[in-house]
């Protein structure tokens, strides 16, 4: 599939709109926007996003994810199609949500490895967010795509960057090594710049697909969540990203502004971001966000 076809499928297949903007009738004070741009590398777009609302078992869910593929887009595409379904199929999703997410991450990775002849030798990072009834946000991630929360204009990182240097002992305990070549970032076995990922069959014995997971209450101080691939975080800090978009009323415009700023700062990677926006009651009459 050509890069342009992939981008088109991303836009029309996930939010039900080609504008990159979504709104739920149930949560009239919550909206989301997203945007993405292909990097300067000579390969098709490898970032995939999910940004949608759905009702499951009588609960209203917001599902948000960034999948940043490497060495091909097939694993990221597979995750876009299957990971949330696998999470929601876990029998204990409503009683032990974190355990359900962890099990789904690991079992999904097992399927990806089994299908490596079809899906290729590459892999993908993932950061996922499940918003439950507008009250609780559960974040999980492997790799270096991030989720950042803004409360009263202050950035707080909800995900964990799984850098090889931080997990060197675990990698070495599995028989791998972390390279530290001057002028380059640390890499697992001299190849991969993240210590946790989906796929990557040739490196998997030295990698993990076990996610870091945390939950956050959504309260009146919560303004928005920012999900973005590392093409953003290579060129700006969490607070710089929040400061850039916190005064923008339309979440799609906010996502677009963030990507344009990353490109202007010479980010050359594929970049994707999602901005779920929470309208505080006192601001409903003042702020347009749909």
UniProtKB/Swiss-Prot annotation:
Residues involved in Mn(2+) 2 binding: 68, 230, 269
Pfam families recorded: PP2C
Binding site for Mn(2+) 1: 68-69
GO cellular component, one term: mitochondrion
SMART domains: PP2Cc
Note on cofactor: Binds 2 magnesium or manganese ions per subunit.
Keywords recorded for this protein, A-Z: Hydrolase, Magnesium, Manganese, Metal-binding, Protein phosphatase
Cofactor(s) for this UniProt protein: Mg(2+); Mn(2+)
Factors inducing expression: By the avirulence factor AvrRpm1 (at protein level).
SUPFAM superfamilies: PP2C-like
InterPro entries: PP2C, PPM-type-like_dom_sf, PPM-type_phosphatase-like_dom
Protein name: Probable protein phosphatase 2C 20
